[in-house]
């Protein structure tokens, strides 16, 4: 039986269109993860972002805001991606912007080009 605990993920650059699309995909998962939105800046203020559908609260980009997440998605600027790597070098990062692809420790993946037997299979209920 699969665990139903809610995973915790962070999204740096939480106010971008890419982050919004990522949130839609993640919220459709079961169980949906708890999503922690992080602004691409290090300002000490909490940022409120409003669009047509919802209001999002984003915390500043700090080492503390990156703690306790299973994974951090990078959806902001190249500068915010580099700052995230510096602040939390041991945190698993998924760079959706390819800002860190030249880092020596980066693991590049192209799921659509991988053999079918290495892709994650969808669970059926």
Question: What kind of feature is each model-predicted range?
Answer:
Residues 1-125:
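N-terminal Rossmann-like NAD(P) cofactor-binding subdomain of oxidoreductases
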């Amino acid at each position: 039986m699969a665990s139903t605990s809610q995973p915790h993920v962070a999204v740096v650059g939480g106010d971008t269109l890419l982050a919004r699309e990522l949130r839609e995909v993640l919220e459709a998962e079961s169980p949906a993860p708890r999503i922690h939105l992080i602004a691409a800046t290090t300002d000490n203020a909490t940022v409120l972002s409003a669009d047509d559908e919802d209001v999002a609260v984003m915390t500043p980009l700090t080492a503390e805001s990156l703690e306790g997440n299973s994974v951090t998605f990078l959806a902001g600027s190249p500068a915010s991606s580099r700052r995230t790597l510096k602040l939390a070098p041991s945190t698993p990062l998924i760079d959706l912007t390819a800002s860190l692809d030249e880092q020596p420790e980066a693991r590049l993946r192209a799921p659509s080009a991988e053999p079918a037997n290495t892709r994650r299979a969808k669970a059926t209920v």
